Amino acid sequence: MHYEPFAIYSKKVTSLADLQDGAHIGLPNDPSNETRALLLLEAAGLITVPEGTTAASSLTKYDITAEMNPHGYVFDEVAAELLAPTLEDYDIAVINGNYALDAGLKPTTNGLFVEAADSEFATLYANIVAVRPADLDSDWLKALHTALTSKEAYDYMINTYEGGVIPTFTVEDAE
């Protein structure tokens, strides 16, 4: 139905171009989110990752060689839920969408670089409704699906969360 994009945030720089060599970068310390964060840093042009790395890979800061990190950024691994409240401790931090929203951060206004809505992660990490096979044709599920994929739900996500929650369906699908 929707996903919350990762974004790069900072209280110290207003542009990634201002990031100094040796800057400290806060990363989520759990495997799936750290991979996602490192791939976002690559998409932003800050580092490179090993060839063949995908969203399904398990990547950590230890996989990033000096050659892949020519600016000598220091990666600080922290529990994902602590990155937004401690943002001032890092030059930049890659923060999960839900934690950013909880801290009042919005990708479109506060994010220095935001995960693309058509990224591999948008599909892989989309929030969905899972049901038992026996309920697939139930009236309540049809009603729930209609409500969650309605134009009203689409507009609510777009207007309320300002890029912090992205519908995985199009407005045309909702009409």
Tell where the protein language model's regions lie, with residue ranges.
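A bilobed periplasmic-binding-protein/Venus flytrap-type ligand-binding module shared by bacterial periplasmic
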Residues: 4-16, 125-143
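Ligand-binding "clamshell"
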Residues: 13, 89, 94, 103-116
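Solvent-exposed loop/turn segments at secondary-structure junctions
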Residues: 14-15, 31-34, 81, 98-102, ...
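Periplasmic-binding protein-like
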Residues: 35-42, 146-169
